[in-house]
Amino acid sequence: MEFNDVLTNQPICIDNGSGVIKAGFAGEDQPKSFFPSYVGRPKHLKIMAGAIEGDIFIGNKAQELRGLLKIKYPIEHGIVVDWDDMERIWQFIYTEELKTVSEEHPVLLTEAPLNPRTNRDQAAQVFFETFNVPALFTSIQAVLSLYASGRTTGVVLDSGDGVTHAVPIYEGFAMPSAIRRIDIAGRDVTEYLQLLLRKSGTIFHTSAEKEIVRIIKEKCSYVTLDPRKEEKEWINASISGGKDYTKEEEFKLPDGNVLRLGAERFRAPEILFDPEIIGSEYSGIHQVVVDAISRVDLDLRKSLFGNIVLSGGSTLTRGFGDRLLSEIRRLAVKDVKIKIFAPPERKYSTWIGGSILASLSTFRKMWVSAEEYQEDPDIIHRKSI
């Protein structure tokens, strides 16, 4: 099959998230495949002939058998730390999820900005040499989120499981020198919630139980507008024996026990705005946005403040947008108009943006072909967004 013929095939778009991987065919409005990006291996000895076959589990099967498995994420803070497992996940996407062959479809792959060059080099090597893809294109996640929102100007705040970054884009031009990134995101919130629950007497220690903590975080946590005031209210409620304090929430654990959640619900996501709580020297998420905007030309700042677009699972936390707005107001120039857009589909917006971009006929010249890659592997750094 000629290269140009292969390029007319539907591209595959893979949003390679630290916590959740999204994959599907370009041109579709949502990913066909969506599952936690971990690999599970049985941690117990198999003694019965009828036991489940296989020694590696990925996707929904890994979620179902979570309690039997040792769970490992191959991506940490946006960077692949285990390439063998990463390759297994990509293979699983092709064979089990999309049910297609890698040789016939170009691939659009996402990655976090300011990642080490070696991460992209290795990914390209796997796709071209192991999967024999006809063409590849690598894009920064935030840029695609802006595509999905239908804008060409804005600052995208993308906070997923491993990385939080703010990327200013003006009339379609990304500004690499203004990109700000912090390695504090959803997984750190999960780990801190795990610690807070341990302090209150509920211990989750296995890798599978940590997944339960993640679900508790997603269902029960919220961001408060005023943490000091909220803290006082909780302290007063506990002093007055407030067992029925209205903000307490119950969560039913898989074994049927009920967990009562108190102040942990807002204390855990608070680390996004105040990373010092966990001893980190990173700036808060609101500071990251303002820093990114303040690094661009004075003339452009006004329109960026008026177009802040949220993306990624961590921004779905209840109260996140309101708190972000109030914190940015405090840091920004007095009369500047601040508008935050929170698209309802922002959990998938990077993938949706990639799907739109890869299906454009004008995008065809952007692909890095296998032939170009063989001649000059460095081209994947030059031909990218």
From Swiss-Prot:
SMART domains: ACTIN. InterPro entries: Actin, Actin/actin-like_CS, ATPase_NBD. One of its GO terms (cellular component) is cytoskeleton. CDD domains: ASKHA_NBD_Arp1. Disulfide bonds: none annotated. SUPFAM superfamilies: Actin-like ATPase domain. GO terms for molecular function: ATP binding. It is found in: Cytoplasm, Cytoskeleton. It comes from the Eukaryota. Keywords: ATP-binding, Cytoplasm, Cytoskeleton, Nucleotide-binding. Belongs to the actin family. ARP1 subfamily. This is Actin-2. The lineage of its organism: Eukaryota, Fungi, Dikarya, Ascomycota, Taphrinomycotina.
